[in-house]
């Protein structure tokens, strides 16, 4: 078994909506990013890549490459997952924690779980997504951006 951890953060800027966990969420602010700014899928992709010792999202999809400008993070997750499967790994489970004062994530979490399960080709019970605040402390608490952490458990596929 192999465990990976991922972290991502994006500052608010411009106009909304935002995309988190593949879900378009109405909000007055947008997120500043080279791709679509999906902190949940970026952290998750990093966790999966880390567990497979394949580097990170920036190595695989560099923000200096114009090909990834405005990229759909679900597509990036699916491509990373293909590479991980090619190394002979299967998914144990993933756990994602979104850290944001606003907007409220709870109404969107069920759809995030559906999208992640679809993208990883796994069962819903292998995907957990939750959200928390920092009780108005730090940059997320001041409403300056959103952060996310994720962990992933991979196992070698049976031969």
UniProtKB/Swiss-Prot annotation:
Question: Could you tell me the keywords of this UniProt record?
Answer: Isoprene biosynthesis, Lyase, Metal-binding
The keyword Metal-binding is assigned to this record: yes
Q: Which cofactor does it need?
A: a divalent metal cation
Q: What is its EC number?
A: 4.6.1.12
Write down the position(s) of the site called Transition state stabilizer. Answer: 34, 133
Q: Which GO terms describe its molecular function?
A: 2-C-methyl-D-erythritol 2,4-cyclodiphosphate synthase activity; metal ion binding
Give the record's pathway: Isoprenoid biosynthesis; isopentenyl diphosphate biosynthesis via DXP pathway; isopentenyl diphosphate from 1-deoxy-D-xylulose 5-phosphate: step 4/6
Cross-referenced InterPro entries: MECDP_synthase (IPR003526), MECDP_synthase_CS (IPR020555), MECDP_synthase_sf (IPR036571)
Q: Name one GO biological process term.
A: terpenoid biosynthetic process
Q: Does the keyword Secreted apply?
A: no
What reaction(s) does this enzyme catalyze?
4-CDP-2-C-methyl-D-erythritol 2-phosphate = 2-C-methyl-D-erythritol 2,4-cyclic diphosphate + CMP
Q: State the free-text cofactor note.
A: Binds 1 divalent metal cation per subunit.
- PROSITE patterns, alphabetized: ISPF (PS01350)
Q: Where does 4-CDP-2-C-methyl-D-erythritol 2-phosphate bind?
A: 8-10, 34-35, 56-58, 61-65, 100-106, 132-135, 139, 142
Q: Which family does it belong to?
A: Belongs to the IspF family.
| Protein role | Involved in the biosynthesis of isopentenyl diphosphate (IPP) and dimethylallyl diphosphate (DMAPP), two major building blocks of isoprenoid compounds. Catalyzes the conversion of 4-diphosphocytidyl-2-C-methyl-D-erythritol 2-phosphate (CDP-ME2P) to 2-C-methyl-D-erythritol 2,4-cyclodiphosphate (ME-CPP) with a corresponding release of cytidine 5-monophosphate (CMP).
- Give the quaternary structure: Homotrimer.
This chain belongs to the protein called 2-C-methyl-D-erythritol 2,4-cyclodiphosphate synthase
Organism of provenance: Salmonella typhimurium (strain LT2 / SGSC1412 / ATCC 700720)
Source taxonomy lineage? Bacteria, Pseudomonadati, Pseudomonadota, Gammaproteobacteria, Enterobacterales
Instruction: Identify the coding gene.
Output: ispF
């Amino acid at each position: 078994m192999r465990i990976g951890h991922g972290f991502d953060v994006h500052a608010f800027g411009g106009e909304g909506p935002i995309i988190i966990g593949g879900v378009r969420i109405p909000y007055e602010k947008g997120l500043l990013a080279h791709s679509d700014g999906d902190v949940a899928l970026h952290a998750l992709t990093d966790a999966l890549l880390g567990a497979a010792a394949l580097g990170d999202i920036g190595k695989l999809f560099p923000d200096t490459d114009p090909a990834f400008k405005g990229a759909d993070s679900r597509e990036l997750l699916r491509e990373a997952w293909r590479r991980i499967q090619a190394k002979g790994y299967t998914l144990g489970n993933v756990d994602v924690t979104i850290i944001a004062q606003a907007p409220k994530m709870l109404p969107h979490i069920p759809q995030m779980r559906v999208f992640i399960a679809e993208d990883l080709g796994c069962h819903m019970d292998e995907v957990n997504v939750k959200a928390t605040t920092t009780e108005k402390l730090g940059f997320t608490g001041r409403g300056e951006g959103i952060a996310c952490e994720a962990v992933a458990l991979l196992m070698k596929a049976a031969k």
